[in-house]
């Protein structure tokens, strides 16, 4: 198997932007003394048979040169690793080629902007370079096992005893305290209607105690392996604001495939603290209203398999059900009992209606883009000109 490890890494153009509310959970400061990426790459040096690493460098266009220089400094400090760096410069060439292949269906669906589009850019780069398996890893994670790649590719591309193909699988992460479970210490009215911890932990405990490979209701985007038979046929959704990893599970099920869980494949997750929570909550509001609208639309398409809340219990079923009234309640109480009063109050007053409008206007957008995806992948596969661009030989 010719696998590659794909790592999206998020950078700010300056210190002021690093902690500003924005599209991504965190962005590394340009002058950070101990950047997450350096720690992640250092952990990969111990891995046996580590393949090519593709770094997707996400940053403002105006900061591309400075960020590229900083990232290359970090990469040069790990000479035993084979790293292909993809900045806005290389990504724009791939996006241009995608637009030529599918002029009516691409837009920014394959780019370094937006979680789903960034994942698609990783898949596009893998296709250009001829890799038949992609292992996604996040830059705020560290690998804790020298057999990481052996575990990553275990059973991938094979079948279960029932003859079901294992084309996508997820591992899981340990937090700072060494636990694979979601913390249950956040209680009180601010979390009363907006917590998935109990349902998630119930599912996770069962998965951890079962066979090594089991059918999954969960995806850890920072530890996810995809075979080419999946990623050349099913794209990530570039229209979802966050949660593109779990959404990929829904997409796979729509097309009649399963995602699998490997309870022996792990990393350690060490995310930086988030300074503001209301922007992330707003993204989640958009996410869940859009998800419900998209799945409802897809359920009416004859050629697709309906994805229902009942089939995703105990988690994440409730989040795609009609229980989304929890959004308004949560926004209201957080506007009263947190320091981010203005942010949550704006969500309560306007954000929910805006999210509903977005969901209604885009319920068919993913399937429209997805119809072009197999052709995009076929045309990109081992593209000689793009290969020379990515490998710096053009």
Q: Where would I find each of the regions flagged by the language model?
A:
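Active-site-proximal specificity loops/subdomain of glycosyltransferases
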Residues: 68-125, 129
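Short beta-strand-to-loop acidic/aromatic patch adjacent to the donor-nucleotide binding site
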Residues: 131-145
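Conserved donor-nucleotide/metal-binding helix-loop-beta segment in metal-dependent transferases, i.e.
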Residues: 144-168
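Short beta-strand-to-loop element that shapes/binds the nucleotide-sugar donor at the catalytic cleft/hinge
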Residues: 163-187
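A recurrent flexible, glycine/aromatic-enriched loop bordering the glycosyltransferase active site
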Residues: 205-225
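Acidic donor-binding loop at a coil-to-helix junction in glycosyltransferase catalytic cores
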Residues: 241-248
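Terminal low-complexity segments of carbohydrate-biosynthetic enzymes
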Residues: 283-394
């Amino acid at each position: 198997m010719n696998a590659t490890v794909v790592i999206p890494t998020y950078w700010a153009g300056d210190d002021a932007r690093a902690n500003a509310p924005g599209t991504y959970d965190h962005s590394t400061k340009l002058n950070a003394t101990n950047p997450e990426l350096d720690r992640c790459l250092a952990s990969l040096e111990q891995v046996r048979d580590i393949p090519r690493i593709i770094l997707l460098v996400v940053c403002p266009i105006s900061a591309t040169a400075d960020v590229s220089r900083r990232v290359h400094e970090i990469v040069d400090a790990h000479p035993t690793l084979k790293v292909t760096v993809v900045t806005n410069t290389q990504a724009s060439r791939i996006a241009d080629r995608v637009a030529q292949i599918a002029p009516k269906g691409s837009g920014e669906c394959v780019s370094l902007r937006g979680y789903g589009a960034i994942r698609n850019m990783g898949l596009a780069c893998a296709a250009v370079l001829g890799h038949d398996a992609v292992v996604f890893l996040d830059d705020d994670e560290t690998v804790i096992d020298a057999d990481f790649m052996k575990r990553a590719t275990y059973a991938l591309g094979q079948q279960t005893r029932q003859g079901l193909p294992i084309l996508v699988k997820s591992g899981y992460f340990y937090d700072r305290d060494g636990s694979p479970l979601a913390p249950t210490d956040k209680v009180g009215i601010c979390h009363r209607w907006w917590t998935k911890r109990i349902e998630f932990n119930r599912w996770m405990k069962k998965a951890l105690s079962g066979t090594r490979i089991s059918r999954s209701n969960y995806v850890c985007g920072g530890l996810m392996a995809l075979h080419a038979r999946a990623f050349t046929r099913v794209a990530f959704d570039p229209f979802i604001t966050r949660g593109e990893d779990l959404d990929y599970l829904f997409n796979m099920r729509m097309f009649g495939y399963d995602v699998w869980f490997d309870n022996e494949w792990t990393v350690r997750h060490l995310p930086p603290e988030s300074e503001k929570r209301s922007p992330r909550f707003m993204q989640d509001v958009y996410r869940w209203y859009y998800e419900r609208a998209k799945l409802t639309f897809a359920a009416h398409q004859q050629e697709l398999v309906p994805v229902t809340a009942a089939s995703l219990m105990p988690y994440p079923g409730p989040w795609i059900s009609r229980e989304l009234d929890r959004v308004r309640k949560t926004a209201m109480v957080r506007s009263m009992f947190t320091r981010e009063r203005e942010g949550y109050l704006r969500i309560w007053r306007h954000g929910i209606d805006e999210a509903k409008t977005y969901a209604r206007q885009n319920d068919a957008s993913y399937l429209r883009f997805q119809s072009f995806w197999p052709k995009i992948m076929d045309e990109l596969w081992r593209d000689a000109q793009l290969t020379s661009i990515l490998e710096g030989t053009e």
